[in-house]
Amino acid sequence: MLVLIDTDPAISREDLLQFEEFLGKNLPEAMKNFYFQYNGGQPQVKGVHDDRHLFPFNSFDSLEEMRKSMKWFDDEALPAGFKATDLLHFAYDPRSGNYALSLRTEDYGKVYFYVLEEKAELYGQWPSFENFLNSFVEE
């Protein structure tokens, strides 16, 4: 069971509804349920794996941090084929890696892990937020 420390104050249903209005999209149910339980924070884990690799993981963003992050990323800082409005950044690794939920129609709800160095490179992906949550390797 995933347990987080250093979480922000709990969010209300109204907070989440306002965030979805801001996005213009409904979040996946698994993500809503997660954020009702934990508003950001750090899990005590070794990492998170996809079908092939184990990736480092640091922390989940709070709802407010996710809202702010919508202005932090521009198209040039994203993997090829993505625009800034296509991804909801919700977590990060200890370096320059980002975890983001796709907001695009063609792959809505899919989770991507990419690293931004000279250019953004995709390294990991999960079919859903629920699948992502079930892929953590605990310490």
Regions found by a protein language model. Give the residues of each.
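Generic detector of low-complexity/intrinsically disordered segments
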Residues: 4-6, 56, 103, 118, ...
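Residues in well-ordered beta-strands of folded domains
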Residues: 91, 102, 112-114
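A short, sequence-level motif marking secondary-structure junctions
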Residues: 60, 104-107, 129-131
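Compact, glycine/acidic-enriched structural inserts
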Residues: 117, 121-139
